[in-house]
Amino acid sequence: MTGNAPDLPAFAALARAHDALLYVDDAHGFGVIGDRDGYEPGPFGRSGNAIVRYFGESYDHVVLTAGFSKAYSSLLAFVACPTPLKRYLKTMVPSYIYSGPVPVASLATALLGLEVNRRRGDDLRAQLWHRTRTLLDQLDKLGVATSNTSGFPLVELALANAEDLDAVGRHLFDRGIYVTLAPYPVVPRREAGFRVQLTAANTAEQSTIS
């Protein structure tokens, strides 16, 4: 819930050293962060092809799962993994074998989202970084602590009294601000609070604290 990425290269190196598989759930990173090769327009990288490429890693000994529900607003998910493992999963994993086809509407939404990503995704990612940076800088000036040190667009704010969480959520919602509540056991007891998720569609005014 912190909005920070783990030290993926260290975990990947450990997995390869012991011939193990590293399972990575990149629910929020897919579509937002990606390749960094010196040509990207902003700190989030380019292409939005997820955290493995963001850190310049390969899929050797790595299994990545990600979904389209965050960046693409579509009911779709996928697994990226080494080819031999892919063959095994397609024939041996019940959750895949007994699953049905993707709803056509969800598939159409995902395809259109990928086209938007191809055409102007890097510009949207750069804009998202600026919106996030604006919010984080203002919180810092106000002395409001957040665990976000990466600059990624997930900003978690802890409350001094966890019992106020629901009331705070309602207070913000009534004022047109939707946040995700993070109670225990989703987070440790002392870190209960809420999470602000910014998008490229947020305006400069919406990411400014007034």
Q: Could you say what each language-model-derived stretch is?
A:
Residues 122-136, 140-176, 186, 190-194, ...:
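Conserved PLP-binding catalytic core of the aspartate aminotransferase-like
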